Amino acid sequence: MAKGQSLQDPFLNALRRERIPVSIYLVNGIKLQGQIESFDQFVILLKNTVNQMVYKHAISTVVPARAVSHHSGEQQRAPSDRPEKTED
């Protein structure tokens, strides 16, 4: 998985799973609103009164209507949680 998607996928998945309304701004300035129904590597399926398939390369910004809790999949440990080196 590409590094960019390790942040993107959990964020979009949290928006989808929690059914958080989003505003999606396209690179041409158009604003779309709805809920993320599904997504893959190239598109987002946005549901409102109709379903719209939006190509990710056309998206500038995704703005959730409220805060979203998400994890990047990579857990970061505090320095105290790291195993200490032992010398044999």
UniProtKB/Swiss-Prot annotation:
Annotated organism of origin: Vibrio atlanticus (strain LGP32)
Entries under PROSITE patterns matching the protein: SM
Listed HAMAP family: Hfq
Keyword RNA-binding: yes
Region (Disordered): 66-88
Functional summary from the UniProt entry: RNA chaperone that binds small regulatory RNA (sRNAs) and mRNAs to facilitate mRNA translational regulation in response to envelope stress, environmental stress and changes in metabolite concentrations. Also binds with high specificity to tRNAs.
Domain Sm: residue ranges: 9-68
Gene: hfq
Classification of source organism: Bacteria, Pseudomonadati, Pseudomonadota, Gammaproteobacteria, Vibrionales
Keyword match Protein biosynthesis: no
Subunit structure: Homohexamer.
Family: Belongs to the Hfq family.
InterPro entries: Hfq, LSM_dom_sf, Sm
GO cellular component, one term: cytosol
Start-end of Basic and acidic residues biased regions: 71-88
Gene Ontology molecular function, alphabetical: RNA binding
GO BP, one annotated term: regulation of RNA stability
Protein's UniProt name: RNA-binding protein Hfq
Pfam family, one: Hfq
Annotated keywords: RNA-binding, Stress response
